[in-house]
Amino acid sequence: MNPNYLDFEQPIADLEAKIQELRKASTGPAVNVDAEVRALRDKLRVRTAQIFRDLSAWQVSQLARHPQRPYTLDYINTMCDEFQELAGDRAYADDKAIVGGLGRIDGRPVVIIGHQKGRDTKSKVARNFGMPRPEGYRKALRLMKLAERFRLPLLTFIDTPGAYPGIGAEERGQSEAIARNLMEMAELKVPVICTVIGEGGSGGALAIGVGDRTLMLEYGTYSVISPEGCASILWKDAAKAKDAAEQLGLTAKRLKGLGLVDKVIREPTGGAHRNPEQMGKRLKAVLLNELDALEKVPVDALMQQRYERLRSYGAYEGH
């Protein structure tokens, strides 16, 4: 898969193009460009490290939305020995923007739920661009209760611009579906680990985002609104999205500092899409480590810790 370069990655694209040109020029035995290629590769590594060392919040937002970024099903395929997807909310329909089911990770049974976007036009429409409707959140709730019934740990993967705001979704109770999930997840009697793998957009993300641990990939985002939406409201100008991204504090590093995220998982240089296999293995190792810790905690203590965790959000000291 050829990388889809973002605007701030243009120096990287230029260097990689030069390397490709040299390779094409060295097709004959009389031409040896190994030294030049090595020099360019060294320069590429240095330049890439420089660019990704100090990304702005807006640049991180672009990476979180990268069209080649791994989605929930990609991670499931990498991490799970086996996986059986379950469909439908048993009331209205099957929302393809939410996927979930039963799986095994290194033989350990788990329930997995996550947002799912599409790759091409057809699948993007089928997945509604990763924006769930009420039936998607009710499907997720069905799987949550299944996890509780069979005492299986729950893993959720968050990657959505937000819940779908269409008229039909509102008529079918979008806000109620999200609110119910928040309430039910707070009381699930099994370990729950939530991971932001891409975009974490407002209530659409929170509806599968309440748990005992909140993990976040290095170039993910988590916010009450998109930078463009925030800019349109505050400055009446979507072009000020860069400023809005900084003000929203939506990056993993910032949220970890605020105590809203427990662990930031480092991505491969250039982002998860540059090496999805490596990212999947790294995420798997972290999840298994967190599960080992949580499964040692008695249920009553787990519930109390989760309650105290949720009550701590937004707390401040002052006169």
Curated annotation (Swiss-Prot):
It is an enzyme of class 2 (transferase). GO terms for molecular function: acetyl-CoA carboxylase activity; ATP binding; carboxyl- or carbamoyltransferase activity. Pfam families: ACCA (PF03255). GO terms for biological process: fatty acid biosynthetic process; malonyl-CoA biosynthetic process. Keywords: ATP-binding, Cytoplasm, Fatty acid biosynthesis, Fatty acid metabolism, Lipid biosynthesis, Lipid metabolism, Nucleotide-binding, Transferase. GO terms for cellular component: acetyl-CoA carboxylase complex. PANTHER family: ACETYL-COENZYME A CARBOXYLASE CARBOXYL TRANSFERASE SUBUNIT ALPHA (PTHR42853), ACETYL-COENZYME A CARBOXYLASE CARBOXYL TRANSFERASE SUBUNIT ALPHA, CHLOROPLASTIC (PTHR42853:SF3). Belongs to the AccA family. This is Acetyl-coenzyme A carboxylase carboxyl transferase subunit alpha. It comes from Xanthomonas campestris pv. campestris (strain ATCC 33913 / DSM 3586 / NCPPB 528 / LMG 568 / P 25). The gene is accA.
